[in-house]
Each structure stands twice: as structure tokens, then as C-alpha cells.
Amino acid sequence: MDGKEASLSAQERPVSDFPDMLKKFAAAVEANDGAGLAALFTADGVYEDGFYGACTGAAAIAGMVAHFHETGESFRWEFFDPVSDGRAGYAHYRFSYRSKVAGAEGKPVAFEGIGHFALRDGKIARYCEVFDRGVALAQQGFAADRIKRVVEKAAARQNATPEFAAHLRRLAERSA
């Protein structure tokens, strides 16, 4: 550890094993290992899924992984170009699976996104992601009105967050 890193608190130090954390994260989801994924999170950790919303704590995170495998199979998750400063991490990803949803059984679903990891003491305090939900839903052959409902729900959830509400207020002030 160099002098600069030694002067940083443990929370501020770069996570040198962030790529390894991503490998464990992906492997746990692929293997339906909810406990393994939850172990990467802090006790109060939050996994904010792009479809299912926020899951807080080990039991909820493990349950979400089980739900993934109820609605899909043959998961593949690959992370690329990871960067982290010890407090935050980002990685580009490719995610794919075969749908088990009624009416879309066996259809391959693949999309790209960006994962954001808020880190604390070498664990994930919060994970959220950005991807095009419409791309994922369209590959399952869902009707346009169903896709629209899902995307509108995601937009409402996004716009209701305190951060985004403040952003939209600034937009309204600028437009006035």
C-alpha cells in the first residue's frame, strides 16, 4: 500500500478485488445461489433490480435470486471494464437467459447495461442498474401495451426518488 492509500480510511481505499467481487456476483446469480449473492452485501444492503425494484437485506436478496430462476433459466452474466475507487464501482455488463414466463417459454433474452455498486467496508451497500427494459421485454414477444405498462411503472418509480424529484423540480424551474 502506498503512502496515499495508507492515509485513506478503510472505507475510502480502492477495492482492489472489485473484479473478483463482480465474478462472485455473476456466478451467484447464474447458479441460483441467493445466499452467496447476499454474502457480498452489507447486512443492510440493497439490490435494486431493474424489473423487481429494491430488495433490502440478505433474505430479500436471496428471495429475489430465487424469483429470477422461477422466471428464467440458463443465466449468463458478464461484467466488463470495471472501475472502483473503494466507495463506488461501475461495470458494463451483458446479461442473458432463457425465459420461463408463460407465453415466452424458452425465448432467449439478452441485453446490455451498467451496474452501479455503492461499496462500504469491502461489501456492496447498494447495487442498482441501468438497462433498456423494453429490449428485454420485446425479446419475449410481449404485446406493446404490456411493455408500455412495465416501462411506465419503471419511469414512475425513478421519478419518485428524492434525487430525481429534485432534478425534475430544477427542470420545471428552468422551463418556467
Question: For each of these PLM feature ranges, what is it?
Answer:
Residues 10-14, 19-40:
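Short acidic-aromatic low-complexity motifs
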Residues 22-25, 29, 41, 65, ...:
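Hydrophobic alpha-helical core bundles mediating ligand binding, dimerization, or RNAP-core interactions
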Residues 23-26, 55-66, 167-171:
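Short N-terminal helix-initiation segments at or just after the protein's N-terminus
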Residues 34-87:
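A solvent-exposed, acidic/Ser-Thr-rich amphipathic alpha-helical stretch
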